[in-house]
Amino acid sequence: MTTLRIATRKSPLALWQSEHVAAALRQHHPGLEVVLVPMSTRGDEVLDRSLAAIGDKGLFLKELELAMLRGDADCAVHSFKDVPMELDDPFVLPAILERGDPADALVSNLYASLQALPLGARVGTSSLRRQAQLRAARPDLELIDLRGNVNTRLAKLDNGGYDAIVLACAGLQRLGLDERISARLDAPEWLPAPAQGAVAVECRGDDARIHSLLAVLDAGRTRACVEAERAMNRALHGSCHVPVAALARWEGEGLFLQGMVGSASDGRLIHADAHGSADDTQDLGRRVAQGLFDKGAAQLLAAL
């Protein structure tokens, strides 16, 4: 086989990520032709409700997975934070690329920080995780749902609908929009979504040739971090659309994992953290989840 077909969403960020994967594959496999197969997903098309309100798992994956099952694509590229905790058979993730910036960004045309926003400022985000942390930091803010791709959200800000919006740093940086970042929202005060900033490549587990072609892109240190974060989320019975945050980083030869569960309605936040071995990321994730449960996380999650 001399051609590899990558199923991808049509947004500028998704196309950038898929072309980034394609370029890396061409470099590793001279002579391999890599082409993109752009398509729309339910998550792209339903824009009048928040992701949490839509509720389906795999909102940004299903159409891409169907393309692989039909034989119309060989693999798919995803923002890892959008990937459900459990993949359907026969799908696997042979490659997780080196992580970009995991932090969130405050974007505003007038204000340089979260604390600089005026009383009652209008802030756009549909993420329950971001809403919970915004309410904790600034309970006076008016939080307004905001959906669409990065450029659509920026246009809504520029048209005066919001005083500020919250986006992922990695998405802005990948699109060459670093200058739009007014302030980074950083750990430990502010935590990102599990696996935020990481790109995952999915394929059929029963296609050994495709799996082998893709596996050369896997970044082991990134995989360890995001697997610990997702293990915590899985132990909380969470999904991509609940107010759960996590960030793991390397400390020496091991990992340090910080986790958070929040309430988007009143800004209550529960934090826990732990150190653990990179050889047992599942145990580390479970221990941080248990620390959150011990502090009352189940009650916050049950209120959703």
Swiss-Prot record:
EC number, as in UniProt: 2.5.1.61
Family from the record: Belongs to the HMBS family.
Protein name per its UniProtKB record: Porphobilinogen deaminase
GO BP terms: protoporphyrinogen IX biosynthetic process
Source organism of this protein record: Xanthomonas oryzae pv. oryzae (strain KACC10331 / KXO85)
Cofactor: dipyrromethane
Assembly mode: Monomer.
Entry's cofactor comment: Binds 1 dipyrromethane group covalently.
Xref: NCBIfam families: hemC (TIGR00212)
Misc note: The porphobilinogen subunits are added to the dipyrromethane group.
Transferase keyword on record: yes
